[in-house]
């Protein structure tokens, strides 16, 4: 399935149906009086978070969504039927923004969440509504109200517990394929990963979702390479696993480069808990490995993990470190319970 994480859509709710001008006509009833019914309300436009989706690709092929108009009222006090609704189905993690791309309309993070995007117009009153003590036969009715229309942006931010960051070819996709059932494209050239991927990690008796995004390079926040637009998909992660390629010239410099891009991007990414690991340890000789570990330790200020996704060296330790960091982050984010009132 192709991946799309941003789409622009036009939504319009249905117009309300017009009220009816009608009079009761029956045998032996000389003055039947007005019996025009009200118009039906126009259909609404909703957005609903559904299970089984992880892309907005459907909105590349259809951008206009219009609900049905309400039906007109008719005689014998019959009201018009309500217009049919339109529902935009989106994956969990979808943000809905106004046309200016800054005003947040809704943030759908749970399956089953619904938000009203455009309310249908009210139906007009029939002439029976306007009957008064001085006007027993009104000959006018209301037209229905017009529906609402908007241009909106849909922006997907994948929901994962932990995210992988690093330079291209740091081994992120290999790590994801090793610890989950995901099958990302893996090759020995930069930018093999062109869109984010998700996988479910099982550690002992627990599970969490891990996200892999395309690699960052120097100047990514200015649009160099694939840019930093995919960093939005790790904004919701509680913890980052920063992989640094062991075969790079200087592991410490590679680490600092990615950290600089995270800080330039903002949105709190640089402040998230981070597990640092030196990858591809299986192809380094002991002397070179120790030098890279020392360089990385000097850059990040703590002893990094040493892993190899190919041989699974250090992988269980990295996963357990992620779990522990997630537990700490969740405990810090949990609001303190207020003490119960006692007389």
From Swiss-Prot:
Q: Which residues bind GTP?
A: 166-173, 191-195, 212-215, 279-282, 308-310
| PROSITE patterns in the cross-refs | G_OBG, GTP1_OBG, OBG
Q: Which domain of life is it from?
A: Bacteria
Keyword tags: Cytoplasm, GTP-binding, Hydrolase, Magnesium, Metal-binding, Nucleotide-binding
Which residues are recorded as binding Mg(2+)? 173, 193
Q: Which GO terms describe its molecular function?
A: GTP binding; GTPase activity; magnesium ion binding
Report the residue ranges that make up the Obg domain in this protein.
Answer: 1-159
Query: Main subcellular localization, coarse class?
Result: cytoplasm
Which InterPro entries does this UniProt record tie to the protein? G_OBG, GTP-bd, GTP-bd_Obg/CgtA, GTP1-OBG_CS, GTP1_OBG_dom, GTP1_OBG_dom_sf, OBG_GTPase, P-loop_NTPase
Alphabetized CDD domains for the sequence: Obg (cd01898)
Q: Name one GO cellular component term.
A: cytoplasm
Q: Where is it localised? A: Cytoplasm
Gene3D superfamilies associated with the record: GTP1/OBG domain, P-loop containing nucleotide triphosphate hydrolases
Q: Which GO terms describe its biological process?
A: ribosome biogenesis
Q: Which intervals hold domain OBG-type G?
A: 160-327
- Subunit notes for this chain? Monomer.
Its function, per the record, reads:
An essential GTPase which binds GTP, GDP and possibly (p)ppGpp with moderate affinity, with high nucleotide exchange rates and a fairly low GTP hydrolysis rate. Plays a role in control of the cell cycle, stress response, ribosome biogenesis and in those bacteria that undergo differentiation, in morphogenesis control.
Task: Return the protein name.
Answer: GTPase Obg
Give the species.
Answer: Methylobacterium sp. (strain 4-46)
Q: Cite the source lineage.
A: Bacteria, Pseudomonadati, Pseudomonadota, Alphaproteobacteria, Hyphomicrobiales
Q: Which gene encodes it?
A: obg
